[in-house]
A protein has these predicted regions:
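Nucleic acid-binding interface residues in structured DNA/RNA-binding domains
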Residues: 1-105
Length: 105
């Protein structure tokens, strides 16, 4: 059975470690197509299992959270990340410190 694009995205998002974040583009590339960044956003907005697919760990390349975070808005996303120890500088995730270092093949 072939995985759908959303399933590929969810599999990558599940791998983001506790206390770290990844970018939409990073998830897109790891899921198979670096041009899927916008699709990653759609997939996360339709997340069927937020308890097991930590979509709140995905931020934009500058480290900004989504105002349209589907599970409580940007403030909820910030709250969830802070609970994991992720620090923010002027409202942005400190990407040098918290970006997931998973290599892209």
């Amino acid at each position: 059975m072939q995985q759908s694009t959303f399933e590929k995205i969810y599999e990558v998002v599940k791998q983001i470690p506790y206390g770290q974040v990844a970018t939409y583009g990073q998830i897109a590339a790891l899921a198979g197509n670096k041009r899927w960044a916008r699709v990653v956003g759609y997939a996360l907005h339709a997340n069927p299992d937020p308890d097991n697919i930590p979509c709140y760990r995905v931020v934009n390349k500058e480290g900004r959270v989504s105002d349209a975070f589907a599970f409580g808005g940007g403030n909820k996303q910030i709250e969830l990340l802070k609970e994991e120890g992720v620090e923010f500088i002027n409202g942005y995730v400190d990407m040098k410190k918290y970006q997931w270092e998973r290599p892209i093949y």
